[in-house]
């Protein structure tokens, strides 16, 4: 089972206009209720790849009820811990002609310590029964900052694969807990760790720093720019595809889904990188969020350049041959 943890889900009310006139009344939008949150995006993209996942989240109030109904409408499996605070929500306004998306978020919910304790209790049992656990998205309050490090420690205890894709004040504690893999945007790392990462040398030093913390795979994406990844102490530079970007929302989550797809299918590291990078690019080329077709990924993934930095791995062809 693929288990996905989302501490801060998002109820989106999406308004799509042909074109927006700023400072004026804009009418006749196409409206849609949408289940958001980084982990939910990962789950949606995995479903497009034919992989079933199970979501575990906080949910509260009227917004939480509407969010859960949206999950049911998408046939995304989930369970939740109820909160007294409302699930956060956002208005997402799209101007199609201008290719502009604007998002307006509410404040994050305050999660009570009793709700955190209940979440952790159930999390222990769920991690025991999964193959891989993904911790995705932000922590909504100080009380929830301990959940992801705790979950990573559980995954290590039960010998499960863990992927950490979070940011904020708790990120250092998450890294110190030693997840199997980490995905982060480079700007998030710089902000969370207060590191001065200016060039390839400093990025390589940081990747080696994480490797010595027993983190096996690291992905430091950087929007549409070249980025770096590591597989143990082997480091790669990746050149993403040049695309016309519409909305990059969910591209990081689609990337994570691509990495999970590669792990489940036992793909070579470089192949999984190409697949994940192509998925992220295709996501950014549409106003949809994490809804990329696998056939489209397969068509373009080999156009992604993956270049080794430093020592190179040797690929052994062990396919059967006639004697």
Q: What is the role of each PLM region?
A:
Residues 110-112, 139-143, 170-172, 245-246:
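Short, small-residue-enriched loops and turns at beta-alpha junctions
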């Amino acid at each position: 089972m693929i288990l996905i943890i989302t501490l801060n889900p998002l109820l989106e009310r999406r308004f799509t206009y042909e074109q927006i006139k700023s400072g004026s009344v804009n009418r006749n939008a196409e409206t849609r209720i949408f289940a958001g949150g980084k982990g939910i995006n990962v789950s949606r993209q995995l479903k497009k790849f034919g992989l079933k996942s199970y979501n575990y989240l906080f949910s509260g109030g009227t917004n939480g009820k509407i969010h859960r109904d949206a999950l049911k409408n998408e046939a995304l499996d989930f369970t939740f811990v109820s909160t007294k605070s409302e699930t956060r929500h956002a208005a997402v306004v799209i101007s199609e002609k201008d290719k502009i998306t604007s998002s307006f978020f509410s404040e994050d919910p305050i999660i009570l310590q009793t709700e955190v304790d209940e979440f952790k209790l159930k999390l222990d049992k769920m991690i025991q029964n999964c193959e891989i656990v993904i911790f995705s998205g932000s922590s909504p309050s100080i009380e929830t900052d301990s959940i992801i490090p705790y979950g990573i420690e559980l995954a290590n205890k039960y010998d499960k694969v863990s992927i950490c894709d979070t940011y904020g004040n708790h990120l250092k504690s998450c890294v110190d807990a030693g997840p199997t893999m980490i995905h982060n945007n480079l700007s998030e790392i710089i902000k969370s760790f207060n590191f001065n990462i200016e060039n390839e040398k400093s990025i390589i030093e940081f990747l080696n720093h994480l490797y010595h913390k027993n983190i096996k795979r690291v992905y430091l994406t950087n929007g549409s720019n070249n980025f770096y990844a590591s597989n143990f102490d082997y480091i790669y530079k990746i050149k993403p595809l040049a695309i016309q970007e519409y909305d990059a929302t969910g591209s990081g989550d689609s990337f994570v889904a691509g990495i999970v797809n590669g792990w489940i299918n036992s793909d070579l590291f470089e192949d999984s990188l190409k697949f994940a990078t192509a998925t992220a690019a295709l996501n950014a080329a549409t106003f949809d969020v994490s809804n990329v077709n696998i056939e489209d990924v397969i068509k373009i993934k080999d156009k992604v350049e993956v270049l080794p930095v430093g020592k190179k791995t040797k690929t052994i062809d062990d396919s059967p041959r006639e004697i």
